[in-house]
């Protein structure tokens, strides 16, 4: 697994790209599932108007962003979907990387059951941040959980491919930060 020191880099854009191709692993409730990280978004507080910690705003929900890098920041979006972020950087520097999509690697059958995805297109199983959490069983219970633990970690194993950058999704309110290419996608060659 990646050491805690990996997550302490203060350059969240670098880490959002560097996480691509690594395998996100969960071993929860006796079931192991994992996926290759293929899409991320960087959130760089305090200046990023799309970031929960814009202008050093602190709420009960976003407090994990102010922790040392290497923990999970999981929150509910629209009161329905859990979203999983990797907290990066040093204490009190509110940076995080949203894991937007994975490519199933281990336990795809378990992911299908968790998502009730039988007889549906496999390429849509984990192609969104809420779907990732459902497939890997990442719930609010694991908010602030160490990402260097047997239960949840990111493997040193890394797949390569072509990386593209695009604007982040769903942040129309973020003014000049709306169109920055802080979303990173990995296209793995077969």
Swiss-Prot record:
SUPFAM superfamilies: FMT C-terminal domain-like. InterPro entries: Formyl_transferase-like_C_sf, MPG, MPG_sf. Keywords: DNA damage, DNA repair, Hydrolase. GO terms for molecular function: alkylbase DNA N-glycosylase activity; DNA binding. It is an enzyme of class 3 (hydrolase). Its EC number is 3.2.2.-. CDD domains: AAG (cd00540). One of its GO terms (biological process) is base-excision repair. Belongs to the DNA glycosylase MPG family. This is Putative 3-methyladenine DNA glycosylase. It comes from Chlamydia abortus (strain DSM 27085 / S26/3).
